[in-house]
């Protein structure tokens, strides 16, 4: 018997929730109506261009298949359909254990405009998403108990290994989350793995196959794009990271490409606990803009007033290429790139400019086997290189255009070991690039 795939149409302009939603002439009116629909492989949800879904959200826990993914996108002409969650779409996040830093928050309510919960083989594209404070709720922007918010949250918990998560051409902005809660689903796009209710039955919660591409993310807090924080973090202690650990407990086949992140309150783009993730052709501008005493003023015991641009956390053989980072704001980090507690990170063919914390850091004792080559740094500030307690790093054939008075090694972050070979260092007078 031939499978009948359904397409659900939704229009805030011409729809009615009493319609069947199965044609452009009989669309639903609200996203709430979709929550009554069970989705099957090959099904589609299409929102009409020009529609605005105010105080609404879309939470999905159904899955497609490798051959027939579920698709959520747009139809018609005009502006992308808009989902303005405004603090709705609240769900409870719980890692089921303390995080790698016990001071970090590991459970609590989260508001997500789009939530994929144990859903796989699903493609979301061509939507505009915001998640600000509700007009009926008074929330101080930097309050310690401010609601965690996401544009798009993806969660693995009770479905074992999730495959085929594809996000493309999303415009996500004005997501006013909690700036202090680093590892809650908090920011533009954030994917996490939580402790399963019965891991012996469902298997380890993890991701194998994530593609985030052509997305624009701006004015979000805390993270721009983060993929892969996991309840299994204790499996990844130490400097040498075994491939087998990632195949069983970490993330695989993570590709983040051609995304733009601007004015994230904290970090721009970070794959986490991933084996050979590829992060390429992305741009970040003016991020870490809330890592300052004016905004980050009530952290309590959470600390965490640090952020960098495009970097990995606890990954093995991560590749970063053809990325660009500008104007990172100064904090304890504040550099464009950061090989952080990973094994075998490779940065090549990247560009950085006027980042207040410098070009690149090799962060602490568990940052090993890292290579930084064929990159260009123009007028980065604060100190170009930050070998901070790392045992090794190979820095070769890069071009550094350094403003007079800016040190090659950042002060108080230069006690690690690096090997410098065939780098071109040119002194410049000022930000306009005039040579001395």
Residue ranges and their predicted role:
Residues 4-6, 40-44, 68:
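Loop/turn elements at helix/coil->beta-strand transitions in domains of secreted/extracellular proteins
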Residues 6-8, 26, 81:
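Structural signal for short hydrophobic segments within the conserved structured cores
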Residues 12-48, 53-54:
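Acidic Gly/Asp/Thr-rich repetitive segments characteristic of extracellular carbohydrate-active
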Residues 32-38, 53-64, 82-85, 273:
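Short, T/G/N/S-enriched strand-turn elements that build extracellular solenoid repeat scaffolds
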Residues 46, 65-145, 171-182:
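Right-handed parallel beta-helix/beta-spiral solenoid domain characteristic of secreted/periplasmic
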Residues 57-60, 91-115, 138-158, 180-203, ...:
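Extracellular beta-strand/beta-solenoid scaffold signature
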Residues 69, 76-78, 120-131, 160-176, ...:
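Right-handed parallel beta-helix
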Residues 435-436:
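C-terminal accessory segments
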